[in-house]
Structure formats: structure tokens, C-alpha cells
Amino acid sequence: MKFISPKTDFAFKKIFGSIHSQNILISFLNAIVYNNQNIIQSLEIINPYNPGVTNTIKETYLDVKAVLDNGSTVIIEMQVLNVEDFEKRVIYNLAKAYGNQLDVGQGYMMLTPFVALTIADFVLFENTDKMITKFRFKEETELFNYQDELTLMFVELPKFKKELSVLETLSDKWIYFISSAPNLEVIPSSLEEVSEIESALNIANMANLSNEELEELEQQEKLIRDKKGQISLARKEGIEIGREEGIGIGREEGMRILVKRQIRRKFGEVPPEVQTQIEQLSLEKLDILGDEIFDLAIIADLENWLANNG
């Protein structure tokens, strides 16, 4: 078996936002939003995925939207690249979605709570090791909530370090699925025992995709590669500008600093031995690593790269 990565816009919508994905999405949201509690019993997926619709990266910045049985709405985004002003965009999209609930003449009592769940393939909050973080309006000193109407939640995939053999909770298994599905060759028994994850893996099985869907997936992956290339080029140009302006950092040291920063943003803090290996890389190897880091899914991939290129 070969599984597609759930991190692409196409795959995420197909797995979690299709018309038949209700049970998959219920299990996922109960695990992530409600801390492995069976809170959600039913939901309605708004504007479910249809093949052939996704043409560009993040036309709407909103992968999946669902109304829960408690009246709340969850908007879910899978974000692969840490683009400029990303954090502000998340706030803007949540506030805009909340305000757009009302039609002309409707009163504020018609407003219902909104949750923005963002799954990031990079590190957002370097000051904490928490993988799942939740933000609400709180009083500054006594920290009591002001109207639980707006919630921001983030899942930082690079902070997830667990191997398949030590997965415990439902959230562990869902995050492992999102992080590592392309590395699987069969459906592991520990994931298969969760029927919704088994269903998600069957959807992600490349053999079950139509030619139209395979073409759409290829287009998405190409767009992501192109975007990564643009970011890599901008990084290189930044180094050259810094060198020409005489910042006082040699090209190799400047490249090393940038690569280490990229690694920290993607994987969080790395073991000392990995840091030592990075310190020993030549300028040429640092340049290559800077280009290829976006394709390394987990810390083990980075360790393997260093072992082969050190």
C-alpha cells in the first residue's frame, strides 16, 4: 500500500471534508478539540469536498468547516508553509467567520461559538513544548473567560515525537496519521482498531484515487514544491544581501544560523547530537539541507539525512 500525505490541501479535504467523512471528522475533533472525550455525536460538513475543485493553494484558507450538534462551528485549516503574517490571518479569518453569521436584521443572540483549529507543519510557539494549544479571551490578572464564543486552537506537528509503538490516546493516533501516513506500507493494527482512522487510511490509499484525483494531487504537490522553492530562493537572496551589506556574519555561518532556525521552526528543539552534526556541515551541505528541509516530515528523517550527508 502507498498512502498520500494528509497535509496537502487536496488530501485533507478529501479525508476530513467529504460528504461521507462525518464519522472520521467526529472522531478527529473529539480527540483534538475535546481532549479525547466523546463529546460530539453528530455534525454537518459545510460545502463538502468535490473532486476537481481545488486548483490553487489556499484560495479560501479554509480546508474544512463543520457545524457541531451543540451549535458550535469549527473551521479547520492544514498549513504546510509558515508564510508571512500567518498568525494574523488566522485571527482575521476567525473573526470574519464569526461576524458573517448574521444576516441583515438578525440580533446578536443568533451568534453561535466558533473554533478555529489550525494544524501547522512547523513550530509556532517556541516558548512551550505543548503540541496542542488553546486560546480564548481571558481577564488579564484573574484569567477568567469572557464569553466562550471564540477559540483559537493550534496543533504543531513537529512537536509530536512519538513512534507508532508508543501511541496511547486517540489524539496520538490521529496526529501520527497526519504526520506519518506516507511512511506506512500497511495499516498498523494499533491504527486499524480505530475504525475512523482505518477509514481515513483507506481514503488516503493511493490505489483508491481516480485519475482525476491523482492529477489534482499532483498539481497540489507541484504548487507546494514551487512555493517552497520561492521561500528557499528568498532565503538565499537574504543571505547574499546580508553578506554584501557586511553584517559581519560570514556566508557559511549565516547559512548555518538560518538552517538551524528553519529546523527549530519545523521540528522544535532537536537533540544535542543533531545540533553537533549541523555544526559540522560544509557550506555546500548547509545549502542543500536548506532546500530539502521542507521535504523532511519528522525528526527521524532529518537524522537520516545527516547520517547520509555528514
Predicted regions and their residues:
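Elongated, amphipathic alpha-helical interaction scaffolds
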Residues: 1-310
